[in-house]
Amino acid sequence: ITINVKCTSPQQCLRPCKDRFGQHAGGKCINGKCKCYP
């Protein structure tokens, strides 16, 4: 699930993904946007 959060590294996506989808969510940075894996 791509969310509207800009990023340059996967670390920047972990917090917003966990906030939205819970503790077990992961995140990647793809094309400058965060993609979450709930």
Curated annotation (Swiss-Prot):
GO CC annotation: extracellular region
Organism: Centruroides limpidus
Disulfide bonding pattern of the chain: C7-C29, C13-C34, C17-C36
Swiss-Prot/TrEMBL domain comment: Has the structural arrangement of an alpha-helix connected to a beta-sheet by disulfide bonds (CSalpha/beta).
Localization annotation: Secreted
Site (Basic residue of the functional dyad): K28
One of the record's GO molecular function terms: toxin activity
Tissues expressed in: Expressed by the venom gland.
Note: This toxin is found in the venom of both male and female C.limpidus.
Function: Inhibitor of voltage-gated potassium channels (Kv). It is capable of displacing the binding of radio-labeled noxiustoxin (AC P08815) to rat brain synaptosomes with high affinity (about 100 pM). It is also capable of inhibiting transient potassium-currents (resembling I(A)-type currents), in cultured rat cerebellar granule cells. About 50% of the peak currents are reduced by application of a 1.5 uM solution of this toxin.
Protein name (record): Potassium channel toxin alpha-KTx 2.3
